[in-house]
Amino acid sequence: MPRNLSPYPETQGYVDAEGSRLFYRSLGNLTSPAVLVVHGGPSDHRYLSVLADLVPNGYRVVWYDQLGCGRSRHPRSFRDYSMEAAGRHVEAVRRQLRLGRPHLFGHSWGGALALQAAVLFPRSFRSLTTCGGFASEASFQRAMRQHVHGLPRAVREPIERNERVGRYGSVEYRAAVRTRQRVYSTGLRVLPYDFAASLSTVNRRLRRAIYGDRPGLLSPATGFLQGWDLQSGLRRLRMPSLVLSGTIEAGRYTARDVHRWLPGSRLVTFAGAAHLPFYQVRDRFMEVLLTFLRSVDRS
C-alpha cells in the first residue's frame, strides 16, 4: 500500500468479522460523515480508491477488503460463506469502526452485498448507493442475456453460437468475450493502475464459490448466488437510495430492477459509460454522488 500523500488523516488496520480478520483503510477526518465502500470483483478495494475524491468535499471514506480478498483473511474453504454472511461482514466493519450510520456504497458484486447489508440492517445506514449492482440471481442472468443480445452482430453471434453448443474454449468465442469485456464492461483503453492492481488479485476460488463452475457468460450460477433474491426485502426498505450505471454495460438492466424494487430510489445512468463510470466520466459521477450525499445529510 503506498504511503499517504494526502493532507487528510489516514488509518489502516483490521476488524474481526465472525472470526475472520478483514483489512480496512480510512481516509478523512473522523468527525466527517462516513461513506463505507464495498468493492466488487471479488478482488480488493484499491480500484475504488477513486472515491477519495469525496474526502476534500467533507466526507470520510472507509474501504475494506472482503473475506478472501486483498489483505483480508484467505480461508481454505468458502463452504460456510454466503450472501447473508457477507452482508453481516459489512455490518461488522461499520460497528467495530464506530461509524455510526454511514452512507453505504457498493459497486458491481459489491453492490449486491451492499443491498444485502441494507436489507439485513436497515437502521445501520444513512443512505444506499449502488453502481452496476444487482439484487437477484435471476436479474443478473436476465441482464446478461439482454446485454449480449444487444451487442453488435460481430460480437453477439460468436458468443451465442458457441454458448449453444458449449464451445467455451473456441478462439472466436474467447475473442468475442474479450471484446465485450474491453469495450462494454471495462470501457477503458488504458487501465488505471489501481484497477489493474485490483484485477490481478481476483480470487478464483471465491469466484467459484459464488458462481459455481459457470463456463460462459450466459451460464446459470451454481454457487451460493444460485436462487438469491432480495426483491421482497428491497420493497420493504425505507432508505434514501441512489442507483447508478453506465448505458452500455449489462448493469443498466439490473439497475432498472433495483430502482423498480427500491421505494423512492433515484436512477441515474451515465451516457456512453460502461461498468466503471467513476473512471470514464469521473467528474460527472462525483457530481451526482456528492449531490445525493449532501441532500441526505441536509434532510
PLM segments and residue spans:
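N-terminal cap/lid segment of alpha/beta-hydrolase-fold proteins
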Residues: P2-R21
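Conserved HGGG/HGGXW glycine-rich cap/lid loop of the alpha/beta-hydrolase fold
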Residues: S20-H74, R79
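Active-site loop/oxyanion-hole signature of alpha/beta-hydrolase fold enzymes
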Residues: W63-W109, E287
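Conserved hydrolase catalytic core segment
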Residues: G100-A143
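Flexible "cap/lid" loop of the alpha/beta hydrolase fold
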Residues: R126-R167
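Alpha/beta-hydrolase
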Residues: E160-M239
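Conserved loop-alpha-helix segment in the C-terminal half of the alpha/beta-hydrolase fold
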Residues: Q231-A273
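Catalytic active-site module of serine/aspartate enzymes centered on a nucleophile-bearing elbow/loop
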Residues: G264-S299
